[in-house]
């Protein structure tokens, strides 16, 4: 079991309160249809806002257990929707999955996250996203330097 809490006060010291336990779990694993595209997000509340096939990382890093499950289940399209401050992590994930010939979309959230913008606004951004090309990946890498 895993629990998390979120503050709705803008001036809160911590936005999220996660337990100090291993995060090596796949959030909402029982509800994921591995035959469809998946969306990788940072937190549980982001996954709830996305609604369909969203997997929270409980942070910014993707653990090997999730990578293995994605590969084992032959997921073809991976949408990466991490906050803007996690662009470097998004790029690493994208690069990894592109090297395995997967279709990757990085969803540009601007300065928001799915839980703040809501399902409809997120879905619009997801629909507008395009498959990541090598050239666009290099642009993102340049931005991070």
Which residues make up each language-model segment?
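Replication-associated primase and helicase/ATPase modules
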Residues: 40, 71, 76-81, 91-145
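Short glycine-/acidic-enriched loop or helix-start segments at secondary-structure transitions
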Residues: 50-51, 90-92
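Acidic, metal-coordinating catalytic cores used for nucleic-acid/nucleotide bond scission
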Residues: 61-63, 82-91
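Phosphate-handling DNA/RNA-contact segment within nucleic-acid enzymes
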Residues: 1-77
């Amino acid at each position: 079991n895993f629990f998390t809490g979120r503050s709705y006060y803008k001036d809160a010291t911590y936005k999220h309160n996660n337990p100090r336990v291993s995060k090596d779990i796949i959030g909402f694993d029982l509800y994921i249809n591995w035959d469809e595209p998946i969306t990788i997000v940072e937190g549980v509340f982001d996954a709830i806002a996305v609604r369909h096939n969203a997997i929270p990382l409980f942070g910014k890093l993707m653990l090997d257990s999730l990578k293995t499950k994605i590969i084992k289940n032959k997921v073809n399209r991976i949408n990466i929707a991490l906050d803007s401050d996690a662009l470097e992590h998004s790029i690493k994930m994208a690069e990894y999955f592109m090297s395995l010939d997967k279709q990757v979309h990085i969803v540009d959230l601007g300065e928001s996250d799915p839980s703040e913008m809501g399902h409809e606004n997120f879905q619009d951004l997801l629909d507008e996203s395009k498959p990541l090309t090598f050239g666009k990946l290099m642009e993102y890498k340049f931005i991070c330097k």
